[in-house]
Amino acid sequence: MTDALAQVELLRIDHVGIAVADLDKAIEFYAATFGLRCVHQETNEEQGVREAMLAVGPDAGGPRLQLLAPARPDSAIAKFLDRSGPGLQQLAYTVRDVEATGAALRARGLRLLYDQPRRDTAGSRINFVHPKDAGGVLVELVEPA
């Protein structure tokens, strides 16, 4: 194992993101069908997205399901829905230090979407690995607030 490999420390799966056209209908569907509980909702004005975090099972602290709906037609989620339709949009991992993890991944030749981490849901700091460098999967790195 190289030094760069040793520096990447993924702590757990944080959430799986699903793009939806209607956030309220999707929350209702996942609650009624699978018994998931909505534990957080917010609108990210910078990204143009409405989002909800749904808890899976009795442990609200475990991995979550994130529902993402466009808040405006020019958002990345709106473009994703236009291109691919509703469905899986991202896989997110919890990391201790998003900057250090990003630097280690860049050292391996992977591209990140942002030069510097950005603030996101509930004050977390995030960055994304470009899907073309991660087998077609948009990988999100989440450093909790």
Q: PLM features: residue spans?
A:
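Conserved active-site tyrosine of GNAT-family acetyltransferases
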Residues: 26-31, 54, 105
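Short secondary-structure junctions
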Residues: 35-43, 110-117
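N-terminal beta-strand motif that seeds the catalytic metal site of vicinal oxygen chelate
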Residues: 1-25, 86-95, 144-145
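Charged surface patches that recognize polyanionic ligands
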Residues: 70-77, 83-90, 95, 105
